[in-house]
Amino acid sequence: MKFDSNLSINDIETKILKFWKDTKCFKKSNELSKNKKKYTFYDGPPFATGLPHFGHILAGTVKDVITRYQYQHNKRVDRRFGWDCHGLPVEFEIDKNLGISVKQEILEMGIDKYNAECKSIVMKHSSEWKDTVEKMGRWVDFDNSYKTMDLSFMTSVWYVFSQLYKKGYVYRGYRVMPFSTGCMTTLSSSEAKSNYKMVNDLSVVVEFPLKSKLFDKKVSILAWTTTPWTLPSNCGLVVNKDFDYQIFEIDHKFYCMLPNRIQDFNKKEVILHELFKGELLIGLEYEQPFNYFEEYRRCGFFKIIGGSFVSSTDGTGIVHAAPAFGEDDYNCFVENNLIKQNDLVPCPVDENGKFTAEVFDYKGIYVKDADKLIIKHLKEKIFCVKQISHNYPFCWRSEKPLIYRLVSSWFIKVSDSVDKLIKNNEIINWVPKDIKHKKFGKWLSNAKDWAFSRSRFWGTPIPLWVSDDYSEILCVESAEELEKLSGKKITDLHMEFIDDIILTKNGKTLRRIPEVFDCWFESGCMPYAQHSWPFRKVDNLNCEEIRHHFHDSDNTLVYENKILENFPADFIGEGIDQTRGWFYTLHVISTLLFDKPAFKNVIVNGIVLAENGKKMSKKDKNYPDPNIVMKTFGADSLRMYLISSPVVEADNLLFKEDGVKDVSKLLIIPWMNVLKFYTTSLQKRNDCEKLELDNWINYTFNEFLSSVSNYMNNYQLSKVCGLAYKFLDNLSNWYLRIHREEIRSGNTKILFNILKKFSVIMSPFAPFFSEYSFQCLLSSQQNEKSNSINSVHFQMYPEAQDSGDNSFENAKDIIDAIRYLRDKHTISLKTPLKEVKIISDELFMKDAAKFSNTIIRECHVFNLIFVKESEVPELKIEYKAKPCFEYLKKDLKTMNDKIKIINKLTQSEIRDLAFLDLSEEKYNVKRENILIEKKATFPTGLCFASNKFVILVDNTIDDNVLEKKLAREFNSFIQKLRKSCGLKMNDTVNVEVDSEKIKQITKKFYPINFSTEGQIVSPIDSDAQIDVFSYEGQELKVILRLNKFL
């Protein structure tokens, strides 16, 4: 593959994709690594019902970078793709397609037909996914992908569940859960917290008259609610026994609430009466606003009870309790012995969020639509109505507001294992680190029992067969066991294939419970189920159990025998939302099964938002098409843009197309230019001569190599792009520019080696151009011809060489400083500087002096002198010391004392500190705690001061300066003319100009071939190039002739 300057970035990536496919590079790489130590990676399965977006591309890029990098370090990395197939995303799309709004319509249609519809769209966009993943340069195994709907996966989910059941973690109960009326199912706590929106709602303060007098007054208790639709289900009022409550009077009526909240709900004049503790109210009965459930009064309902969750900063300090619709309410009723855990309470709302016949006034009305009707009905009992704006949870799938509702559910007992979860979390390396103890750690510390059952249809059925009274429960652990128990051949575990199976136990008839698993449970089983643990996968429809010999009380032997090689994962990576999703379920299941974490290292990425800061939306069209971005700027540029941003450290990214363009401009194009320079310099070979900056560029490259390795070994991706920019700048704008003539003459050995290694280092990040660069380099070496396939992605990471030195950095700093002075004082680079003096310590000047000729040439200087400060008495240097708070804040106890010491330092003391590190032993302050600024003043010429050196510039103009300026201007004119003619570097020309002065002066400084004639040659050849050079008010005709035309 030869370098072709006519190819665009998109052409190159298309060419490389074809090369990979034609040579089966990915497959070959796996073959080459099959006997190496394994590095385990889990790929979180996406849904193929939607198209891939920038969030998927980000996560996929992070995974690809890490796995390619680990491959380079002698690891075997299985990169197996997976598909999430079950759950609400699929069902909701089918419901929309078929116009289904209630669960009864599914039952009438038939579960078999409904699930067949679901299955038909599961892989709807799989081809688009594969196409996008390949275009972004990710290597992953699609051919051997797992699907959560396959029998081999589902039977393994059953086995995992059966182990949890045997360990006593599974139970059935009632709980107030987040409930989606749009999808007619419960949601997990993490799902419920994933989609909050600001909404306007009506809030009301309702009067609840006490049945008996309080302080000889007929008093109404005032309770506040933002959900008026729950008032028909009121069962109690809750106060805090330690709060002070106030009786107050308005228009001869008496009310009770917190005194500090009265003004928030009342603007009339009030008369204050008794102030007392909430404990006095506990046990008092009141009249409920509706009479639907009056029969519960004999059970102790419709009384005031105590609860610690009551707030003194919002509402009235008195909570209207509807235990069927509030978790705190339900728990408070349990704590007050009004009900037992898992008891039923009035719950007159169905799965569609509509009132049932128990609340006959509002039967069939959707709860949120009933708010205004209820307020109107209770107008005589409403103390006040206010509209409020507040955050409210919405269903992440249907976008309808959630309600909290008492439901029957199956739970995995997690709360008893919080200490284990936290202990295992300590083993995990989180990137960024604060996720461990903040977002994820706090979630773990408040872990609740996991309601894992869902009242849906398209999912893995929960393998529990129960008697009508639940006195007998049988947990089936595999498809094979179900075959033995039922005598029926099992080819599919979806409910339509197994729900007709009736089993018996102890003389009782058992039927399967109707629920399916929360699809998060399936995802959490992925480490085991993708390998069909503990079964051997035969095909997608049949499994054979692998027999294990292990004690019933010790399942660890199964773990040791079967999944030790693949568990825990060395690495996983997904978005920040997965701290409550996949990361959490992986961690819970592995902890409960094996008391081990499921993964060792995890990178948590943030969210990619539109440029305006809003969520990316197809409807709003507020983001570009990823495929167009990749086609325009290249997938490599998109990859590097994403992983070099804070989004790989759990921050959000406002996606900007210009950011991708900048990466192309700063990385790919300079790299391409260096490659082009190399390939066009190969016509001659002269590798014997050692170049002045060879040691420096080798040192710089090894620093780059080591820095990338250090960051990547710590899973810190964001710094790599900046390191690549810096190295390419050093290579292109320093090494190549300074040595361009020598390299053009064939001295390319160092450049070849560096480009080849650079291609290998960059291959995980920019896989396309790395491959192109590598292949171009291989083809440039005639002795490297081979029929075998070779790819940059087969190469191991280069080892750092202990070679080179960094002394040119001092010269570089000097050159940059002189350029800064030129810019500041608007002195053209074409104007030579008469003299430059460098003042510094002896070591600095010794290193810089090695490169005097380079400094002179790069800065266009006549005379460069290195002098001591004492040799320039007119120079005045002032030193100033400031506290460095970045380091001082690490020890807050001593910070103030150290600041006082730093502020008292004298000029001589600061000067000593600038050159000698005596700070800690002499002043009790570390040098790193002090920032030293140097200010220099010089009476004549230009002056620049840094902490390392001072530069004095004599910029006076004399004849020598003017001559060199003219020569440089004329040489620059000739080079531009050559470029406009399209001449190659090795094309030699003769120059004709009608000015002896220009000829003589230019020849002093530049090797230009002038015509021997004293004037313009006539007639002018048709192939000659003509232009005009302006000099001293004259327009001089200049002719350029290729030697072959003369």
UniProtKB/Swiss-Prot annotation:
Protein species of origin: Vairimorpha ceranae (strain BRL01)
A Pfam family the protein falls into: DUF5915
Keyword Flavoprotein annotated: no
Residue ranges annotated as motif 'KMSKS' region: 615-619
Binding site for ATP: 618
Name assigned to this protein: Probable isoleucine--tRNA ligase, cytoplasmic
Principal location listed in the UniProt entry: cytoplasm
Motif residue range(s): 'HIGH' region: 46-56
EC number in record: 6.1.1.5
Keywords: Aminoacyl-tRNA synthetase, ATP-binding, Cytoplasm, Ligase, Nucleotide-binding, Protein biosynthesis
